[in-house]
Design a protein with these regions (language model features):
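Beta-sheet entry/capping signal
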Residues: 42-43, 134
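Active-site and NAD+-binding cores of ADP-ribose-processing enzymes
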Residues: 2-32, 36-37, 59-170
């Protein structure tokens, strides 16, 4: 359910526009406001070529405007590890607003995710309060949650780290 950053295995990359790469390498980040509540604001990393594989088949033109940076997580980070639907639902059901969501209606909980944000209750802020530093979605977890949850738009194995200072880019 949770992993330490030093237990993450495999290649981590961050794709960024050529115009912003130098700033990112110097630790300066600009994030646009989260358009989708299902995607938290943070530094998004491709894990084991998940994003590269997805974009090369689904959106090849996207990569033409980007460059690839190697990424390394700082040690000691606590990441919500989603490798199965059960990994997702255990944490999701701890969130007071959505307790006891059942598998068959999990996707509908996305509507509740939007509603709770309007009421000032934010799932991502709640995770941060629990000292969770980010989310690590495996390829298996992406497929297990894709049609059942609001993780549908995540598309590939990835890691999002809420505070970009916890990632070293090269």
């Amino acid at each position: 359910m949770f992993l330490k950053s030093e237990d993450i295995e495999g290649k981590l990359t961050h794709w960024i526009s050529k115009d912003h790469a130098e700033k990112a390498l110097n630790g300066e980040f600009e994030f646009a406001g989260g358009g989708l509540h299902s995607k938290p604001i943070g530094l998004w990393l491709s894990w084991n070529s998940g994003w590269e594989d997805w974009t090369s088949s689904e959106w090849p033109a996207w990569m033409e405007r980007k460059i690839c940076l190697q990424a390394k997580l700082k040690p000691g980070l606590k990441l919500w590890h989603i490798d199965t639907f059960e990994d997702f639902i255990r944490v999701w059901n701890e969130f007071k607003t959505f307790a006891n969501i059942k598998e068959e209606n999990t996707y509908m909980s996305m509507i509740s995710l939007y509603d709770s944000k309007k009421k000032g209750i934010d799932f991502w802020d709640w995770l941060k309060e629990k000292k969770v530093d980010g989310v690590a979605l495996t390829d298996e977890g992406q497929w297990a949650t894709r049609m059942k949850t609001w993780l549908y738009g995540w598309d590939a194995a990835c890691i999002v780290v809420f505070d970009p200072k916890n990632v070293e880019l090269k």
